[in-house]
Regions:
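Active-site helix of classical SDR
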Residues: 124, 160, 168
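Conserved glycine-rich Rossmann-like NAD(P)H-binding loop of the short-chain dehydrogenase/reductase
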Residues: 32-46
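C-terminal substrate-recognition "lid" of short-chain dehydrogenase/reductases
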Residues: 136, 214-240
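Alpha-helical segment proximal to the catalytic Tyr-Lys
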Residues: 129, 173-177, 231
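Conserved glycine-rich cofactor-binding loop
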Residues: 16-17
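Substrate-binding pocket helix/loop in short-chain dehydrogenase/reductase
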Residues: 100-101, 108-113, 203
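Residue(s) in the substrate-gating loop at a strand-loop-helix junction
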Residues: 144
Length: 245
């Protein structure tokens, strides 16, 4: 009698493009069943899932607003009821609204903090207890080099990303005895739509490797941190930044 093959299931938020898409596709290639999250970018999320399926991977779409705590709880409870405890979650959804602090509106502060930082609680918290009962799991939050060193014109973004690092480190201590790892990835300047307006002649001199990072390079780290081989790595902040820090 052959044993049933158990496919580990993971959720990737903000998986409709950029780093999130790269992580979702790379995870599917590694054999995970990938739950591809989006909010407004349905067509792009469908493209992510289509690429996964075209490469003989498996997954599904899920839609919700990561800033809406009630909806997150409802959707994630339904997801857990359907699939059981997930093996992992990559909390990646994020936005920027840049301005100098003196000119930064309260709305732009709130929207960035709600989307980038509050979403960690809204998405991860409903998934923790099922993981604890199973005594296994991987939690990754995608922070930023801005959360480590701070960037001019990004007090809101830097604050939200630094908050993710603190949350990940604290949660890692709480969950270590349950064999659940919690780590933060802090990308540097990665070639995505988010940096399309950034002048390269200003940015590249600050990067020792003199090039932008690729989403796939961040995704490779995420796949490793999700793996069984990374079971003794927790409470860490690992930056993919070409030597900037």
């Amino acid at each position: 009698m052959s044993e049933e093959i158990v496919v580990k299931k993971i959720l990737v938020t903000g998986a409709s493009g950029g780093i999130g898409k790269a992580i979702a596709v790379a995870c599917a290639r590694a054999g995970y069943y990938v739950i591809v999250h989006y909010n407004h970018g349905k067509e792009r999320a469908e493209e992510t899932l289509s690429q996964i399926e075209a490469e003989n991977g498996h997954g599904e779409l899920i839609q919700f607003d990561v800033t809406d705590r009630t909806v997150c709880r409802q959707k994630l409870d339904e997801l857990t009821e359907k699939h059981g405890a997930l093996w992992g979650v990559v909390s990646n959804a994020g936005i920027t609204h840049d301005n100098t602090f003196a000119g930064l509106s309260g709305e732009d502060w709130d929207s960035v903090v709600h989307t980038n930082l509050d979403s960690f609680y809204n998405v991860v918290q409903p998934l923790v207890m099922p993981m604890c009962r199973k005594k296994a799991g991987r939690i990754i939050t995608v922070s930023s080099i801005s959360g480590i060193m701070g960037n001019r014109g990004q007090t809101n973004y830097s604050a939200s990303k630094a908050g993710l690092i603190g949350a990940a480190k604290a949660l890692a201590v709480e969950l270590a005895s349950r064999h659940i790892t919690v780590n933060a990835i802090a990308p540097g300047v990665i070639e995505t739509d988010m940096i399309q307006d950034v002048p390269l002649d200003v940015v590249l001199p600050t990067i020792p490797m003199k090039r932008l990072g690729k989403p796939e390079e961040v995704a490779a780290l995420a796949v490793f941190l999700l793996s069984e081989q990374a079971g003794y790595i927790t409470r860490q902040v690992i930056s993919v930044n070409g030597g900037m820090v």
